[in-house]
Amino acid sequence: MTFSEILDRVGSMGPFQFLHVALLGFPILGMANHNLLQIFTATTPSHHCRPPPNASAGPWVLPVNQNGQTERCLRFVHPPNASLPNDTQGATEPCLDGWVYNSTRDTIVTEWDLVCSSNKLKEMAQSIFMAGILIGGLVLGDLSDRFGRKPILTCCYLLLAASGSSTAFSPTLPIYMVFRFLCGFSISGISLSTVILNVEWVPTKMRAITSTAIGYCYTIGQFILPGLAYAIPQWRWLQLTVSVPYFIFSLLSWWIPESIRWLVLAGKSSKALKILRRVATFNGKKEEGEKLSLEELKLSLQKDISLAKAKYSTADLFRTPILRRVTLCLSLAWFATGFAYYSLAMGVEEFGVNIYILQIIFGGVDIPAKFITILSLSYLGRHITQGAALILAGAAILSLIFVPMDMSLLRTILAVFGKGCLSGSFSCLFLYTSELFPTVIRQTGMGISNVWARVGSMISPLVKITGEIQPFIPNIIYGTVALLGGSAALFLPETLNQPLPETLEDMENWFLQSKKLKQEPEAEKASQRIPLQPSGPGVDRS
C-alpha cells in the first residue's frame, strides 16, 4: 500500500483538502504585495533643487538640460552680493538645500531624498530584500527538515507580520533595510512550506490544479496591490496595511496539519496516525480512519524512509556528466528568469504609463501566460517551452533598446509581452526541475535551482545603476542573459510523458535510452536510402 492509497481512504479530495488549500493560498495573496511593494513605496517623482533661502524657483535658479527640461540634480551658483545668472551657461552646483518633489505621494525616496547621487540606495534596498529571500531559502530549508514544515510556516508568518509592521516605523534608511531583509527572509520560508504542505496533502492527479490555484493567488495579489497603493498614498501606512494580516494568518496556520511524511521520518508515527484519523473524520470517512494502523502507515512510507537514510549532498549534483549538464543548464535558466523578471516587474515607472494601470496589466498578463504555458508543456514539451519563453523574453527586452522613450505604448506592449514570457518560464521551471532531478536528490536540486533565481533577482536592481553610464546598457544585459538562459534550456532532455527517475542510475539509463530512441529513426531512414542505379542500353548489369 502506498501513501496515496492511504490518502484515498481518508478522503483524497474532500472538504479538508479544500480548506487546506484555501488556508495555504490566502497568505500568498499578500506575498505579491511584499515582493512588489517598492514599486509604490519607492516611486521617484519628478523633482528639482530647492532654491536657496530668500530665492524663488525659476529659470534664473534652475538650469535646463538638452531636452528643455529642468535639471533634477543641479542649480545655478549664486555668489554673495552678485546678480543671478540669466542663461544656462552659468556655473552650477548640487542641490545643497534639498529637493522639491512634484507629487502628493509619500515614499521612501521623498522622505530620505534617494535621488541624484543617492539614487543607488533605492536599488540597494530592493536588493537587500531579495538577499533576505536568498538567505532564507538556504537556512529555512534545513530548519524545516529538523523541526517540521508547520512550525516554520507559523514562525515565518509571525516574522513577516512583525518585521513588516516594524518597517513602517523605521526612523532611518539603514533600519528600513534591516527590516526589509527580515521580510524577505520570512517570505522564503512561507514559499517553501506552502509548496511542500500542498503537495503532501492532495492526490497526485490534483497537484497540478491545486498548485496552479495557489499560483493564481499570487497573480490576484498583483491586482490588489495597485488598488491599495492608490487608496493609501503614504508609504508607512501602505507597508503596515500589507503586513498586519499576517498576524491573523499565523493564528489560522494552527489549523494546517503537519506533513505526514515528516512526522513518520521524525519518529512521530503515532501523531501522524491521529492527524490522519482527524482528516478522515472531517472528510466524512471516520470508519476508514479508525481502520488505519501504524504498520500500514509505516509500510506505505517505507520507500521514503529508505531514501531519507541515503546521504546525498550538493556535490552529487555534479557526480555524472548528465547531472552536471542538467544542473548547469537549469541553474542558468533559473538565474536568467529571476534576473530578467524583476528587471521588468520592478521597472513599472520607466515606461511613461500610469503605474497603477500598468501594474494591473502586468499582473493580468500572468493569467493567459500561465494558461498558454500549460498547453505548450502538454503538447510541445518541456525544453521547447522553456527555451522559447526565455528567448522570446530576451528578444522583447533587447527590442526596448531601439524604441524611443516617447513611444510609450509600444514600449509597454514589449514589456508586458516579456513579463508574460518570464511568468511562463517560472511556471515551466518549477515542473521541469522536479522532473529532471532523481528522487534521491530532487529536494537538493530544487533548492540549488531556487537559489540561482534568488541570486538573479538580487543582482537585477543593481544592474539598473549602469543606466547612468548609458541608458541602454541595462536592457542589453537583461536581454542577453535571458537569451543565454533560453539557449541553455534547449540542451536539456525532454521529460514529457517520461517516468520520474528515482536514483542517479535511473537518470543515466533514462537519458541513454532516450538518446538511443532518437538515433534509431535516423539510422532507419539512412538504411532506407537506396542509391540510384544508372540504366540504359549501354549499361553493364553483370
UniProtKB/Swiss-Prot annotation:
Q: Where is the composition biased (Basic and acidic residues)?
A: 518-527
**Glycosylation site list:** 86
Q: List the Pfam families.
A: Sugar_tr
| Modified positions (Phosphoserine) in chain numbering | 4
PROSITE patterns the UniProt entry points to: MFS (PS50850)
Q: Give the way it sits in the membrane.
A: Multi-pass membrane protein
Q: What is its main location?
A: membrane
| Topological domains annotated Extracellular | 31-123, 172-176, 234-236, 349-354, 411, 493-542
Q: Name one GO molecular function term.
A: antiporter activity
Q: Which reaction does it catalyse?
A: estrone 3-sulfate(out) + glutarate(in) = estrone 3-sulfate(in) + glutarate(out); estrone 3-sulfate(in) + 2-oxoglutarate(out) = estrone 3-sulfate(out) + 2-oxoglutarate(in); glutarate(in) + 2-oxoglutarate(out) = glutarate(out) + 2-oxoglutarate(in); urate(in) + 2-oxoglutarate(out) = urate(out) + 2-oxoglutarate(in)
Q: SUPFAM superfamilies recorded for this chain?
A: MFS general substrate transporter
Keyword field contains Protein transport: no
Gene Ontology cellular-component terms for this entry are: basolateral plasma membrane
Q: Which residues lie on this side of the membrane: Cytoplasmic?
A: 1-9, 145-150, 198-212, 258-327, 376-389, 433-471
Q: Where is this region: Disordered?
A: 518-542
Q: Where are the transmembrane segments?
A: 10-30, 124-144, 151-171, 177-197, 213-233, 237-257, 328-348, 355-375, 390-410, 412-432, 472-492
Location comes to: Basolateral cell membrane
What UniProt keywords apply to this chain's record, in alphabetical order?
Cell membrane, Detoxification, Glycoprotein, Ion transport, Lipid transport, Membrane, Phosphoprotein, Transmembrane, Transmembrane helix, Transport
Q: What InterPro entries does the record tag this protein with? A: MFS_dom (IPR020846), MFS_sugar_transport-like (IPR005828), MFS_trans_sf (IPR036259), Orgcat_transp/SVOP (IPR004749)
Q: One biological process GO term for this chain?
A: monoatomic ion transport
What this protein is reported to do is described as: Functions as an organic anion/dicarboxylate exchanger that couples organic anion uptake indirectly to the sodium gradient. Transports organic anions such as estrone 3-sulfate (E1S) and urate in exchange for dicarboxylates such as glutarate or ketoglutarate (2-oxoglutarate). Plays an important role in the excretion of endogenous and exogenous organic anions, especially from the kidney and the brain. E1S transport is pH- and chloride-dependent and may also involve E1S/cGMP exchange.
Family, per entry: Belongs to the major facilitator (TC 2.A.1) superfamily. Organic cation transporter (TC 2.A.1.19) family.
Name of the molecule in the record: Organic anion transporter 3
Whichever gene encodes this chain, its name is: SLC22A8
